[in-house]
Amino acid sequence: MENRWQVMIVWQVDRMKIRTWNSLVKHHMYVSKKAQGWFYRHHYESRHSRVSSEVHIPLGEARLVVRTYWGLHTGEKDWHLGHGVSIEWRLKRYSTQVDPDLADHLIHLHYFDCFSESAIRRAILGQIVRPRCEYQAGHNKVGSLQYLALKALVTPTRAKPPLPSVKKLTEDRWNKPQKTRGHRGSRTLNRH
């Protein structure tokens, strides 16, 4: 029997972001109770030696599995120390990988109070408008002019601590181009 390879997308991340993600998930599972039904699996409960944690998030019949890894091959740069995240959507026996934006949007649809597009219609009809969205990471588009005006009128309050965002977990602060300064501090190099 020959070896068969299975390829999956693993987002390379900083280990401190993984620690922050895990603590936010646990806080909202056990303290604030906003993550009802979420399941956290520790590294010692996994059969795979590279898995450091798993978070199972029910989405109706389906579920989202956010798996963090350690001990992977290091990246091109010295600071890529072999930590990563994979995001998988599962429904019965079917599974596919999703990107962090879609994962945040799916979580937003199923959990957390939202101040959304329907707020415009409710405000025009004179109904009570919920003044905040608890999960801003789930909004990935620019709102309409009426929505932006209503949002400016009703200032949202910030949830402390913030809700766990898959996009925040996977964003890489090192891959942004550095701004270097030329002679006397003028921005002449790497101007994009």
Curated annotation (Swiss-Prot):
Locations listed in the record: Host cytoplasm; Host cell membrane; Virion
A GO molecular-function annotation: metal ion binding
Site features described as Cleavage in virion (by viral protease), chain residue numbers: 150-151
Short motif BC-box-like motif, span: 144-153
Region (Disordered) residue spans: 159-192
Region entry Interaction with host APOBEC3G, spans: 40-44
Keyword Cell inner membrane: no
Function of the protein: Counteracts the innate antiviral activity of host APOBEC3F and APOBEC3G by promoting their ubiquitination and degradation. Acts as a substrate recognition component of an E3 ubiquitin-protein ligase complex: mechanistically, Vif hijacks a host cullin-5-RING E3 ubiquitin-protein ligase complex (ECS complex) and the transcription coactivator CBFB/CBF-beta to form an active E3 ubiquitin-protein ligase complex that targets APOBEC3G and APOBEC3F for polyubiquitination, leading to their degradation by the proteasome.
Subunit details: Homomultimer; in vitro and presumably in vivo. Interacts with viral RNA and Pr55Gag precursor; these interactions mediate Vif incorporation into the virion. Interacts with the viral reverse transcriptase. Forms cullin-5-RING E3 ubiquitin-protein ligase complex (ECS complex) by interacting with host CUL5, RBX2, elongin BC complex (ELOB and ELOC) and CBFB/CBF-beta. Within the ECS complex, Vif interacts directly with host CUL5, ELOC and APOBEC (APOBEC3F and APOBEC3G) substrates.
Protein name: Virion infectivity factor
Organism, as annotated: Human immunodeficiency virus type 1 group M subtype A (isolate U455)
Taxonomic lineage: Viruses, Riboviria, Pararnavirae, Artverviricota, Revtraviricetes
